[in-house]
């Protein structure tokens, strides 16, 4: 192997030959004149080597780059050979956002797939198709969801919307009744089923509700009013009767629920019936928390379980119990303590 040959020092002897048998050139060329007198752009360039020493060349460190990273200081070409230049070019392309080489997995995914055979296609189609158990479970789940939504809507209708509608209807009926009284329109001695003729006040419960003839659910109770027992077999007295029991029915839950809290009444609490001409003031006397719906004796002129001992002017309030059911009935009784003409103003129970 040929060893590295040291370069001859350039001197003044311009007639001496190079180590390769070539004469030194003129002043300013490599080997002719002084090396310091070479071109300014080539002052840092390493000495050229012949082809025989390329394999043994010691790689030179890369030339320092400028701030922009585009070349060596001094504006000269990149050093380090073609391999270094290729690496520098790759680095520059990477900094400029060139796409990276795709991973083998991505290349495999992008590679075209071979078409499936008919058997494989049918097998995949059967695998994607849900089984009978899955279809049945989905159908049952949809049925349960639909049933739950319908039940929620029904509960919302019963507990909220029926009250909203019944309150509006009852308020309108009370307003119409008061307008008729203010205009001097006289009420007949008897009333049609569903016709309002009085107002019921329960101050402790903040209840003011129209009283209509009959206990029809459609015409009276479901419209937020309370009904007067006036049908044959359950006919009760009117408030202006000299003796008798004035029987009323009302909802405890839903449809305005005017009697929802009558279980909170205590003996002595006032119950007032307002008509076109008079106020009839009753005092709560007793309560029967639970009784059968068929116990119609609670509407007798002198109810046996009320504690009254003889004929008098009584009032009976009936409603369902427990709440949200109609299995039993709750009964509240009261006794009249004052009959006051409207010309004398409101009774104390409505003023205080």
From Swiss-Prot:
It catalyses: The enzyme catalyzes a cell wall sorting reaction in which a surface protein with a sorting signal containing a LPXTG motif is cleaved between the Thr and Gly residue. The resulting threonine carboxyl end of the protein is covalently attached to a pentaglycine cross-bridge of peptidoglycan. It comes from the Bacteria. Its EC number is 3.4.22.70. It is an enzyme of class 3 (hydrolase). Residues 1-132 are annotated as: Disordered. Keywords: Cell membrane, Hydrolase, Membrane, Protease, Transmembrane, Transmembrane helix. Belongs to the bacterial sortase family. Class E subfamily. This is Sortase SrtE1. The gene is srtE1.
């Amino acid at each position: 192997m040929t060893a590295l040959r040291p370069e001859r020092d350039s001197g003044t002897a311009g007639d001496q030959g190079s180590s390769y048998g070539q004469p030194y050139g003129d002043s300013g060329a490599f080997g002719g004149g002084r090396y310091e007198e070479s071109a300014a752009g080539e002052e840092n360039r390493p000495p050229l080597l012949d082809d025989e020493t390329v394999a043994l060349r010691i790689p030179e460190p890369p030339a320092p780059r400028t701030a922009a990273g585009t070349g060596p200081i001094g504006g000269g070409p990149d050093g380090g050979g073609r391999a270094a230049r290729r690496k520098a070019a790759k680095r520059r392309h990477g900094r400029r956002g060139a796409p990276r080489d795709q991973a083998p997995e991505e290349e495999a995914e992008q590679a075209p797939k071979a078409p499936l055979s008919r058997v494989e296609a049918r097998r995949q189609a059967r695998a994607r198709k849900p089984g009978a158990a899955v279809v049945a479970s989905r159908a049952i789940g949809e049925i349960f969801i639909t049933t739950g939504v319908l039940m929620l809507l029904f509960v919302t209708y019963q507990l909220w919307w029926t009250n909203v509608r019944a309150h509006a209807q009852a308020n309108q009926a009370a307003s119409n009744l008061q307008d008729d009284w203010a205009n001097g329109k006289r009420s007949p001695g008897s009333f049609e089923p569903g016709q309002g003729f009085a107002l019921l006040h329960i101050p402790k419960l903040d209840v003011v509700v129209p009283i209509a003839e009959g206990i029809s659910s459609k015409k009276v109770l479901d419209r937020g009013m309370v009904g007067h027992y006036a049908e044959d077999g359950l006919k009760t007295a009117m408030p202006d009767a000299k003796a008798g029991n004035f029987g009323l029915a009302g909802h405890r839950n839903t449809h305005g629920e005017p009697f929802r809290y009558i279980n909170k009444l205590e003996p002595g609490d006032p119950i007032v019936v307002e008509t076109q001409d008079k106020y009839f003031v009753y005092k709560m006397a007793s309560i029967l928390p639970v009784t059968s719906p068929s116990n119609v004796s609670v509407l007798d002129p002198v109810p046996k379980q009320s504690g009254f001992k003889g004929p008098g002017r009584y009032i009976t309030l009936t409603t369902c119990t427990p709440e949200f059911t109609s299995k039993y009935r709750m009964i509240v009784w009261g006794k009249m303590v004052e009959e006051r003409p409207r010309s004398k103003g409101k009774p104390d129970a409505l003023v205080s």
